[in-house]
Amino acid sequence: MSLINVAGLTFSYDGSFDLIFEDVDFQIDTDWKLGLIGRNGRGKTTFLNLLRGRYEYKGVIKSSVCFDYFPYDVDDKDKYTIDVLREIAPECMDWELYREFALLKIDEEVMYRSFSSLSGGEQTKALLAALFLKQNNFMLIDE
């Protein structure tokens, strides 16, 4: 069992007087599957970015796991989809990608098209397939 520990987390954006988080404490067991629910603009994405170390904050965030984040930012969308997926999960074998594609009901031929030619739904499923193969990381899925 691994834990994500948050203690005394306080955060606001530069130039803002409004705190997004103030002295927040909690633990998350990485075996849990949980969702953050709230109205727009309430700090869900900000929290995920704090976990990923994207912003400076006060307090402590400790984790013994690495994080993977979705949506994954693809640098070169003109590459073949298979090449994009190999960058995300370089340790995975092609047969594992085929299996994930089958589970997500994506046609295998999608792998051999440029990523930019895929529909939004196909891009989402392809990226998730690769991220699901990175088994030792904790998935942060944002909208």
Task: Specify the residue positions occupied by each region the protein language model found.
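A short, flexible loop at the N-terminus of ABC-type nucleotide-binding domains that lies
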Residues: 1-23, 107
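ABC ATPase nucleotide-binding domain signature region
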Residues: 30-35, 39, 45-99
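ABC ATPase nucleotide-binding domain "signature" region
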Residues: 35, 124-131
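Interfacial catalytic loop of ABC nucleotide-binding domains
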Residues: 99, 106, 111-114
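Conserved ABC ATPase signature
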Residues: 114-122
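A short, proline-enriched helix->beta-strand linker immediately N-terminal to the Walker B motif
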Residues: 130-138
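Catalytic Walker B motif of ABC-type/P-loop ATPase nucleotide-binding domains
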Residues: 139-143
